[in-house]
Amino acid sequence: MSNPVTKSPNSDQSISLLLNELKTVNGHFLIVADENWDSVNWVDFLNHSSCNVSIISNRYDIAQKAETASISTYFNDLDFSGFKPKSFDGIFFRVSKERANTHHVINQSAYLLKPGATLMLSGEKNDGIKSYVKKACMLFNTSSIPTKFGNQYLAKINISEPNNSKKLDDSNYPSMQAVKVLSEYGLTSKPGVFGWNKIDRGSAFFVDHLPTLMSRFKQSPRTLLDLGCGYGFLCYQAKFFDIKNITATDNNAAALIAVEANFKHSECNVEIVASDVGDVITKHFDTIWCNPPFHKGFIIDNDLTYRFLEATCRLLAPNGHAFYVVNSFIPLERKAHGLFSSIQLAADNGSFKVIALSNA
């Protein structure tokens, strides 16, 4: 494990550690690729690796990139049931930002790995990598000391028969769950969705101002796009404004499952779409609502907000209105300049701000 980290611009160096290891091994390996794997050049990886690799990803954009490189790829909510038991010589996983996701992957590795196979974990100290390695070792009755490479750590855990009493708490990862704070809205959620067990403060601020925002319409809008829908908190409010046609899109498989469950009995016409910032959507919408992310995994992505704004400009109907909520420090107004003829600050509480956009 003495391979140097191959660096590339904006790359996650914990992932570079795993990719370097994959260049040295032979066998059948599974990469669990979440949003942290965004910068990987899969074609280049294949050119430098001789092993048989499959990829499972809970992110639509990551899965599409890997599939385009002709890698065997599975896009789902980290559902490993489609794989044969004990079919892999190793699993490579950069620990997730969400604890439940990481615990779920470690638990499932007991089902997926051959006896004596290897679970490779990487991450930084502040990501909890040492704690995850310790828990995984307790599960598999083994020991492993993570190797330090700069700020990153890499751990090789040799698998033995698991001690099921030491399974990690994954918050019942596969299941839709009633969340007390969401119950008054009739909503459920699940692990794997960002902020799955709470109401995002920015989204709550947005909803508080929806009546004022919607007064900009002379006639009630007929179509809504929730761009980056999560479990559906924003678009669920459409029923209060008589919007009957809703499109909810996200790149996160868990979010798509959750929003589908929340609209299962809705009287609205709801279309749920897996996309990379709306890339596969072509129709136009009277209104677009968005609480965009500005992180990809552990890394701040300064281009992400602009990508959401570009998609909004493309998908907004000529007389439509789009409404965004972002942290107050995000320069959304500046980023929107040149895309929209009208950019108005509708509300600001010092922590979050709501921006109204249109080309009407």
Language model: regions and residue ranges:
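N-terminal auxiliary segments of SAM/dcSAM-dependent transferases
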Residues: 101-178
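Conserved SAM/SAH cofactor-binding pocket of Class I
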Residues: 3-72, 201-290
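Conserved Class I SAM-dependent methyltransferase catalytic core
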Residues: 106, 120-140, 147-151, 231, ...
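Short loop/turn elements that flank and shape the SAM/SAH-binding pocket of Class I
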Residues: 78-83, 277-281
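General small-molecule cofactor/ligand-binding pocket signal
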Residues: 74, 146, 188, 271-273, ...
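Conserved proline-anchored active-site loop of SAM-dependent methyltransferases
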Residues: 90-100, 227-232, 285-298, 312
